[in-house]
């Protein structure tokens, strides 16, 4: 109860601030990889604060919450039902896909075939999606030029470019 009250008050104040600045229409409250029951509770809190907040989720596909999401990004290997994809397009909602450390292929790890990065856009186009989400751009481990691993994650999962304005073949092929 107290937790919900705090979030509703903060989000309502945030919405007011965004509207005063003219930024509300370009703001999206985003979450990643949350279970459906958590998302349902979260959406209730957000809607109490302001029913017009745009909400984004990168995670599994859940038909039950799909209509409430302005920007929906599902993991590769899952599919949007065709009628849902078409309705979302008609409603000007973003509909994308992503990869993360759990997909060995295709991906953009330091050991991935560079062609996999170029393939990402082709896949998005084939599926008639709005694009591809790469979860991290420059979240470097301690010594990214010497070791691309972060904890137990695959090498390069946490970044696509190197410090000091250095690009990499993975990034160059992704934007190709």
Residue ranges of predicted features:
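Predominantly late transmembrane helices and immediately cytosolic-facing juxtamembrane segments
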Residues: 139, 144-176
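Catalytic-core regions of glycoside hydrolase
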Residues: 1-146
């Amino acid at each position: 109860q107290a937790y919900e009250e705090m979030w509703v008050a903060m989000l309502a104040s945030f919405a007011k601030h965004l509207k005063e600045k003219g930024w509300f229409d370009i703001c999206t409250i985003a979450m990643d990889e949350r279970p459906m029951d958590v998302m349902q509770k979260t959406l209730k809190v957000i809607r109490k604060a302001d029913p017009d907040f745009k909400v984004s989720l990168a995670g599994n596909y859940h038909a039950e919450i799909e209509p409430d999401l302005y920007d929906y990004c599902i993991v590769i290997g899952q599919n949007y039902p065709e009628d849902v994809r078409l309705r979302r397009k008609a409603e000007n909602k973003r509909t994308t896909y992503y990869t993360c450390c759990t997909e060995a292929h295709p991906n953009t790890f330091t050991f991935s075939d560079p062609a996999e990065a170029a393939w990402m856009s082709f896949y998005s186009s084939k599926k008639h999606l709005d694009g591809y989400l790469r979860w991290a751009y420059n979240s470097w481990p301690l010594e990214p030029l010497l070791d691309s691993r972060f904890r137990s994650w695959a090498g390069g999962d946490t970044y696509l470019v190197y410090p000091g304005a250095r690009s990499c073949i993975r990034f160059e092929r992704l934007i190709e």
